């Protein structure tokens, strides 16, 4: 819902205004009602005594808008959709009006009005709550200074020219309000207008359109007329007004009766257009609330929802059609389905548009087939006059109430001025390549493009303010208008339609336009290369204009591109040109693989790009004939540097924890940027680095498929854009969208695109990984078909697929059994455009699939700009919202590597790890006090450890005093041929009893592995839990995380609270360490030592047994209890645990009943037994410093050393006690826990 409060001032008294407005309403009703397709029916006009405002006049009217809707559209819609109902309660000086449509249930306009004798200074006339006051927008209408549309202007209705003969008033000057406030009379109409159109995809656009055109423009002209007609009403009384109203009602009834009995010719040959207030004039006969009525014929809210028929709606007359199959019944079925989709889901979950989203002025064109985002402007208003009025988005005049938010124009200037000398407040710049959808028939107007950007900006601001406050004021948006390359192709294809001769035919609205052919024809044109060069030039101009603006002074942040349906195609080829021309480190041979001949396959000779080598691909130069005839106008390419509304302006916070990946994704540009070139050239490129490229429903996949068809030897991966990552966002029902991933790896056609989480449910994401490596690992069976996969029978091995073969059972998995098995995975990683998935599917109502295909591109194109799902997704990719966490050690710490990045020791390393993510891990180490302390880790890259880090330096850091959060560098090791390293802690630096976070940082790229070093006393008691055997309530091979058994966390916490060391064991391979620890953290399991199998093995139970044996024999732990599955009974028996110490979860097995205790009643009943004291015993020995307790998921204090009597049970004297008096073990004073963050160089 969009709420605006209008203040309308007039130099007259309240009594005069009441007569003036009522006279104006009845007069306009007479003049502008022409019949059934354009007219008003007055159903009721009677007084009331107990209603809104007390006693007053009630009116009920029906507006007929059929003549203002295209003929093919009228044929589809039932009659009920061509009517708008108005109910009005007039208790002057208070009035209330409500507009509804019987066909669109979730559409409404509510208007409340107070008429007061003041100058509009009262801040809260309607007693709004704090939330409503923050949401509303104030807008003052000036009948003199605000311009009207050119088609509505009349000199006799201009207050600057009008002079009343009878009263002597006028003409009015520009400062008339100040003069009237001093001399009087002066009155103000306070109008609170609430517009709601809660249907998917178009909510913000339609609500803003109704406000700007349907309400403001109508009210402005109506009040100008009320002033300029005063010679006609000044001598009338209220009795005269009531008589005129009755006469008008009879006349309108006769006129409508004639139309109902006459022919239907009015639809085929509609009468002359009445003026804009045709319906508003008759909207309130007997009611001074008339000017808020729906807008005029060509700019009306009813026309807007008529044209926006693809938004959900429901016909109240659907039963009339029965079972007959007709255009009307078909349309009703579609509307009912999409409306039902809206009703079955809560409003918080279904609608992408949010309260307070705003847009600039826009008007729908006349035909759905010509309806596009470039034409949402007033058909009568010129751009110059639209800019001159404060109403089309002039926030400086409308500011948000109560000073909660200053006008954006002044806010941007002030903020930039304050920061100019220090640092740029903007950390992320989005350049929006806006060309429209493939059905746009022309370039449209710049204001309509700006309106889409403003809608997106409002969505950014709303989402950022609620869920990403650290980014508020640090994100800017800039518009880059792009040529409408599909316009000529659309005009050509439209003329080829079998129904092109019949412009009003119903069949023309059906799917006779081959949408897929439009981008293919457009990109095959000889003019396409010139369009790409134009986009490059305009993008550079927009970027340089931002740098020259106060807001962008000193900008060194990351730059991302956003491309709509057609703009995405142009942006992709612009990035390919940039890669070909070379942009710093991006100008490598692997990226320079796009030539100009590929942009237009029909242009120039077709040849094999691989025959000439990769360098040969960049030799082509654009044809001079493709050059634009003149230079690009600067006003079209560069937005205003000041006062622009397409950036999210906010006063920067004094301290901000948000630092995007600035150093790695962008560079500080020079003050001056190259101007737009006159035409494309071999060196045409973007002047900045691009971190990410977001596509909004772009048919780029079809274009790339065509190029591969024309040049079979060309691989899509060769056309590598000069950006770090591409995000292809689309709706599944969008006929224009296409996937990109199957072009890079054909087997991805069997993998569904990732689903973008709904913002209302998961504003910060649902936790799903976007990394390509994780997808390859999850679907490893598709890419490693040569290996025989089997699922182990042991419950502890439910982690994933294990490979069968003797070589894998003995050799480290760093050396695969067959090199060919991972070659395809490596090939995919090398060819991919980034490190994340590319295709992302957005939510849309299923009922949209039933609509004519030709209407969907317009709807989907408009939906992206207001989608909170899209905005939240983009922000999550740009912002490091969640810092890397030390899952094994509770809390991260402030950390900056002591050694800067160095060149790799081996030249091949840089090539091997390109486009693959790190998968380093280090094993948790448990050491008995006084024994050698040895740390081990393994450094791998890619899914399934396809790349090994060999012969590279790794720095080892240990947090010796966890309370301080300070990392100490202990030494440097070099990885071996298997990517492993072993680091013995020097004896002179051996650590005392406690838990110490460890980090092993790769010197070359500062990726790292984490673990914990646990030093315990001899005889420390421990409890062992098998993760898959005792915790999981469901089986998960490689997919979603398994469920946790009820009460499992409480049982583990009980043992920890009793002072026992917790040991977790699992048969999963160590490559899954991060996922398993994240699962433990998600369910708030207490902290403990976690053990994994060393790589892939066919006998995970044997490795678990060996690990536990080492704890008993080498660490001298005393294991007092073990939990697991029936498979673990033999493992625990080998450790010497008695049946009373072995707990098996699940159904009892008869042959094992004598070897263990089955917890058939679950953990809850077992916990009751534990708490009853049946398994507790008093600690022996004196209290001493021991291990601290904490939880994975709960931030606990990091004082890891506490008194043993409270935390850990140990038997026997410690080493310090054996050696006699001396230096006591290191202890830390209790202190306040720190909330610490992690900051790596690679993330700055």
Swiss-Prot record:
Pfam families registered for this protein in UniProt: DDHD, IP_trans, LNS2_PITM1-3, PITM1-3
UniProt KW keywords: Calcium, Cytoplasm, Endoplasmic reticulum, Golgi apparatus, Lipid droplet, Membrane, Metal-binding, Methylation, Phosphoprotein, Protein transport, Transport
GO molecular function: calcium ion binding; phosphatidic acid binding; phosphatidylcholine binding; phosphatidylcholine transporter activity; phosphatidylinositol binding; phosphatidylinositol transfer activity; receptor tyrosine kinase binding
Gene Ontology terms: cellular component: cell body; cleavage furrow; cytoplasm; cytosol; endoplasmic reticulum membrane; Golgi cisterna membrane; intracellular membrane-bounded organelle; lipid droplet
Annotated effect of mutating residue 300 to A: No effect on phosphorylation
Biased composition (Low complexity): 299-319
Catalyzed chemical reaction(s): a 1,2-diacyl-sn-glycero-3-phospho-(1D-myo-inositol)(in) = a 1,2-diacyl-sn-glycero-3-phospho-(1D-myo-inositol)(out)
InterPro entries in the cross-refs: DDHD_dom, HAD-like_sf, HAD_sf, LNS2/PITP, PI_transfer, PI_transfer_N, START-like_dom_sf
Modified residues (Phosphoserine): 300, 304, 319, 326, 329, 342, 345-346, 373, 382, 593, 600, 621, 896, 1237
Xref: PROSITE patterns: DDHD
Result when mutating residue 896 to A: Reduced phosphorylation
Effect the entry attributes to changing residue 1223 to A: No detectable effect on phosphorylation. Loss of threonine phosphorylation
Result, substituting residue 382 to A: Strongly reduced phosphorylation
Subcellular location: Cytoplasm; Golgi apparatus, Golgi stack membrane; Endoplasmic reticulum membrane; Lipid droplet
Expression tissues: Ubiquitous.
Polar residues: compositionally biased ranges: 643-658
Membrane topology label: Peripheral membrane protein
Residues in DDHD domain copies: 686-880
Annotated region described as Disordered, given as residue ranges: 258-331, 339-358, 581-682, 1206-1244
Keyword Calcium attributed: yes
Similarity comment text for this entry: Belongs to the PtdIns transfer protein family. PI transfer class IIA subfamily.
Subunit: Interacts with PIK4CA. Interacts with PTK2B via its C-terminus. Interacts with RHOA. Has higher affinity for the inactive, GDP-bound form of RHOA. The CDK1-phosphorylated form interacts with PLK1. Interacts with VAPB.
Function summary: Catalyzes the transfer of phosphatidylinositol (PI) between membranes. Binds PI, phosphatidylcholine (PC) and phosphatidic acid (PA) with the binding affinity order of PI > PA > PC. Regulates RHOA activity, and plays a role in cytoskeleton remodeling. Necessary for normal completion of cytokinesis. Plays a role in maintaining normal diacylglycerol levels in the Golgi apparatus. Necessary for maintaining the normal structure of the endoplasmic reticulum and the Golgi apparatus. Required for protein export from the endoplasmic reticulum and the Golgi. Binds calcium ions.
UniProt protein name: Membrane-associated phosphatidylinositol transfer protein 1
Species name: Homo sapiens
Encoding gene per record: PITPNM1
